[in-house]
Amino acid sequence: MAKEKPILNVAFIGHVDAGKSTTVGRLLLDGGAIDPQLIVRLRKEAEEKGKAGFEFAYVMDGLKEERERGVTIDVAHKKFPTAKYEVTIVDCPGHRDFIKNMITGASQADAAVLVVNVDDAKSGIQPQTREHVFLSRTLGITQLAVAINKMDTVNFSEADYNEMKKMLGDQLLKMVGFNPDNIDFIPVASLLGDNVFKKSENTPWYNGPTLAQVIDGFQPPEKPTTLPLRLPIQDVYSITGVGTVPVGRVETGIIKPGDKVVFEPAGAVGEIKTVEMHHEQLPSAEPGDNIGFNVRGVGKKDIKRGDVLGHTTNPPTVAADFTAQIVVLQHPSVMTVGYTPVFHAHTAQIACTFMELQKKLNPATGEVLEENPDFLKAGDAAIVKLMPTKPLVMESVKEIPQLGRFAIRDMGMTVAAGMAIQVTAKNK
């Protein structure tokens, strides 16, 4: 059997009307990931509903409700092969109220493709586009390509393409720390397929790569094997004849039998006896591996979901308090000092109190708008100081980004998301 191609996760971001789903549908179709018969059927369905031209987007919008509304809601995962990779597409929604998905979606991505409508050069960059690019950057995405879409609506005009390219570079990408000179801007017409997988004859003035070729040129993610071991516990089983078997996904570092380990904040110390994945014993496990492991010296009652495993020589950080950069996504009123919602960080769910509102930021650029604001409302970005009400493992995103991100939930919805930029460790 040939060695499997490495997987590359690519987030598709941008304003809802830029044609993201159509671009993704076209990549899947021309990449051979969709049965052409399905497209014929969907085309008929789209025409009957008076939405001719939406058939590729239908591929991504599996949900019936989404079909009728013409809006992508959940993060949809689809795969297609390129020469080098098995590409998994994370199709991030475009509307404001779906930024939460954007945050969870983008944080799984190795690279992003920003899809924009060439016509936006006349009306200006959409606020949602700014927010998506800023969030992607905040979430650690460093590889970006830009698909300037709907080129067919401007007769494949090179002047319009150049105007859009310059505007994005000057008014957005440079501001958030991307260098436009290192970014490919591909003129595409996703509905027709121009420059998506196949080189277009309509853009003789463009000598660059197609979108699929640009995706193929992204660098594969490096597994964070050199970072300290961090493994958030999902469940703990007690197996007769074996003992305590915690399970979870290795986020960073390497785990192997014989390792001396500690679970925080539980404080339980033990030694790894065996590591298993899919019922097979492994000599070691690395980031991305979902494993079960047996620990000598630790009982089922000593540890629980939300604890994080690390080596005794470099234990996980239990936060006394932490400073974070957050984006408020939705909130019926305002957030003030003393507000104590539930934080979802790795596998833990712990209430944390807002101790200080230090700075209010422009969500599109990160610049400081106000020092020590009285409150935060939906749409605000901010730097805040937080204190967990119970022991919680949190790492600074500068040191171990995989354990520095969180979502904040209250009243049955995600009200904010963010990342820890500084953590004060609890004294033992």
From Swiss-Prot:
GO (cellular component) term, any one: cytoplasm
Q: Which positions are annotated as binding GTP?
A: 14-21, 91-95, 149-152
Q: Tell me which InterPro entries the record gives.
A: EFTu-like_2, EFTU-type, G_TR_CS, GTP-eEF1A_C, P-loop_NTPase, Small_GTP-bd, T_Tr_GTP-bd_dom, TRAFAC_GTPase_members
| Keywords, sorted A to Z | Cytoplasm, Elongation factor, GTP-binding, Hydrolase, Magnesium, Metal-binding, Nucleotide-binding, Protein biosynthesis
Which intervals of the chain are annotated as region G1?
Answer: 14-21
Q: Name one GO molecular function term.
A: GTP binding
Annotated stretches, region: G2:
70-74
tr-type G domain mapped to chain residues: 5-225
| Top class in the EC scheme | hydrolase
Annotated spans, G4: 149-152
Q: Which residues bind Mg(2+)?
A: 21
The protein's matches in Pfam families, at most eight in alphabetical order, are given as: GTP-eEF1A_C, GTP_EFTU, GTP_EFTU_D2, GTP_EFTU_D4
Subcellular localization, as worded in the UniProt entry:
Cytoplasm
Under catalytic activity, the entry for this protein gives: GTP + H2O = GDP + phosphate + H(+)
Q: Its Enzyme Commission number?
A: 3.6.5.3
In this chain, the stretch annotated as G5 covers: 189-191
Q: Where is this region: G3?
A: 91-94
Coarsely, its chief localization is cytoplasm
Into which family does the record put it?
Belongs to the TRAFAC class translation factor GTPase superfamily. Classic translation factor GTPase family. EF-Tu/EF-1A subfamily.
| Xref: NCBIfam families | EF-1_alpha, PRK12317.1, small_GTP
| Function, in words | GTP hydrolase that promotes the GTP-dependent binding of aminoacyl-tRNA to the A-site of ribosomes during protein biosynthesis.
- Protein name, as recorded: Elongation factor 1-alpha
**Species this protein is from:** Methanococcus maripaludis (strain DSM 14266 / JCM 13030 / NBRC 101832 / S2 / LL)
Species classification: Archaea, Methanobacteriati, Methanobacteriota, Methanomada group, Methanococci
